[in-house]
Curated annotation (Swiss-Prot):
InterPro entries: Metallo-B-lactamas, RibonucZ/Hydroxyglut_hydro, UPF0173_UPF0282_UlaG_hydrolase, UPF0282_hydrls. Belongs to the UPF0282 family. Coiled coil: none annotated. This is UPF0282 protein LS215_2281.
């Protein structure tokens, strides 16, 4: 099995786009890329825009040769109705989606999911609701969790986690569980016993606003439990990498992983690259170069559509 992170915060954008390849299947999870519309009360910097453009091209190129596309929920850094990533990537693909009607918040149920489904209409070879299902495609098994909360607050909606297994190993893609602040977030991992997990980490950059101290502490404790679950590799990236002090936030997890011989890494480091932290450094980027960014129309429309 080969795991290739395509776009993540440690690669300079908001995304969790991941390619997972087994001997007989190529699966693309959450093919979307976004930026924070505002951070430190600043719009995206030109370096962020350039990086998004670069990775969008990579993502579109990767999508040409995949068999399966999975959409874990309807936030714009996980799905795209055509703002930045053209919907032609779904042509002739087997597409698994988060249930657009059940266990979903109102903004996704009544606006985002319907718009997305209209945008890809008649393009996939098949669209299937994935929540709670398991299927075998060749020698590959794909399992989906029932919908679980998008972090500690159900108002942000629900996501599905994904487990992909071949004869040799299993990888879990947690989607946006925000570092697992609820015990229900752990159930799927304990059931599937993966060798590798891709997890987003807590919203520590919003501590005191969206995230409570006790929720952060619970997330860290539960991530420690995940590390103890027989894992070999933990890719922690996405929400927590929006915090410039992410390594300090994750120190308890790193410490336990070191004791157990588990590799904990960002998506960039997994690819043997230095993390390219842009959003968390936006203030610094504008100090270096304060010219307004040239934002393409599609990205401008995406940014005006709102966060998440």
């Amino acid at each position: 099995m080969k795991i290739t992170p395509i776009a993540f915060e440690s690669l300079g954008v908001r995304s969790q786009a991941t390619l997972i390849e087994t001997k007989d299947l190529r699966v693309l999870v959450d093919p979307a890329i976004s930026l924070a519309p505002r951070r430190y009360n600043l719009p995206p910097h030109q370096r962020e825009v350039d990086r998004l453009t670069e990775l969008a091209k990579v993502l579109v190129d990767v999508a040409k040769d995949v068999d399966v596309i999975i959409v874990s929920h309807y936030h714009y850094d996980h799905h795209d109705p055509g703002y930045v990533i053209p919907t032609d990537i779904y042509k002739n693909k087997l597409v698994f989606i988060k249930d657009p009607q059940n266990m979903i918040n109102n903004s996704q149920k009544y606006r985002r999911a319907p718009r997305f489904l209209r945008s890809i209409k008649d393009k996939p070879s098949k669209i299937e609701i994935a929540d709670g299902k398991t299927l075998e495609l060749g020698h590959t098994t794909i399992s989906f969790s029932p919908a679980v909360p998008h972090g500690a607050d159900e108002r942000l909606g629900y996501v599905i986690q994904v487990a992909i297994s071949d004869k040799d190993s299993t990888v879990i893609f947690t989607s946006d569980i925000e570092g697992a602040p609820k015990d229900v977030h752990l159930k799927f991992t304990k059931e599937k016993m993966p060798k590798t997990i891709i997890i987003d980490g807590p919203l520590s950059y919003l501590l005191g606003r969206v995230l409570k101290e006790e929720e952060l502490e619970k997330s860290i404790r539960n991530m420690e439990e995940i590390v103890k679950n027989g894992l070999e590799t933990v890719i922690i990236d996405h929400h927590v990498l929006r915090d410039i002090n992410y390594a300090e936030v994750l120190k308890p997890v790193y410490d336990i992983a070191k004791d157990l011989g588990v590799r904990v890494t960002t998506a960039a480091e997994y690819l043997n690259l230095e993390p390219l932290i842009l959003e968390a450094r936006r203030k610094e980027l504008f100090k270096e170069d304060n010219r307004p960014a040239r934002i393409p129309r599609g990205l401008a429309n995406l940014l005006s559509a709102g966060e998440g």
